[in-house]
């Protein structure tokens, strides 16, 4: 489950839990 928090990212490793880095530059 990915927490619904807007987090800027450049790669999946910047994101929490099962989130991935989306094309818009945020985790999701």
Curated annotation (Swiss-Prot):
<dbReference type="Pfam" id="PF00299">
    <property type="entry name" value="Squash"/>
</dbReference>
<dbReference type="GO" id="GO:0005576">
    <property type="term" value="C:extracellular region"/>
</dbReference>
<keyword id="KW-0722">Serine protease inhibitor</keyword>
<feature type="disulfide bond">
    <location>
        <begin position="2"/>
        <end position="19"/>
    </location>
</feature>
<keyword id="KW-0646">Protease inhibitor</keyword>
<comment type="function">
    <text>Inhibits trypsin.</text>
</comment>
<feature type="disulfide bond">
    <location>
        <begin position="9"/>
        <end position="21"/>
    </location>
</feature>
<dbReference type="InterPro" id="IPR011052">
    <property type="entry name" value="Proteinase_amylase_inhib_sf"/>
</dbReference>
<keyword id="KW-1015">Disulfide bond</keyword>
<dbReference type="InterPro" id="IPR000737">
    <property type="entry name" value="Prot_inh_squash"/>
</dbReference>
<feature type="site" description="Reactive bond">
    <location>
        <begin position="4"/>
        <end position="5"/>
    </location>
</feature>
<feature type="disulfide bond">
    <location>
        <begin position="15"/>
        <end position="27"/>
    </location>
</feature>
<keyword id="KW-0964">Secreted</keyword>
<keyword id="KW-0960">Knottin</keyword>
<protein>
    <recommendedName>
        <fullName>Trypsin inhibitor 4</fullName>
    </recommendedName>
</protein>
<dbReference type="GO" id="GO:0004867">
    <property type="term" value="F:serine-type endopeptidase inhibitor activity"/>
</dbReference>
<comment type="similarity">
    <text>Belongs to the protease inhibitor I7 (squash-type serine protease inhibitor) family.</text>
</comment>
């Amino acid at each position: 489950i990915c927490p619904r928090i807007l987090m800027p990212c450049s790669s999946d490793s910047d994101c929490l839990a099962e989130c991935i880095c989306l094309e818009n530059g945020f985790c999701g």
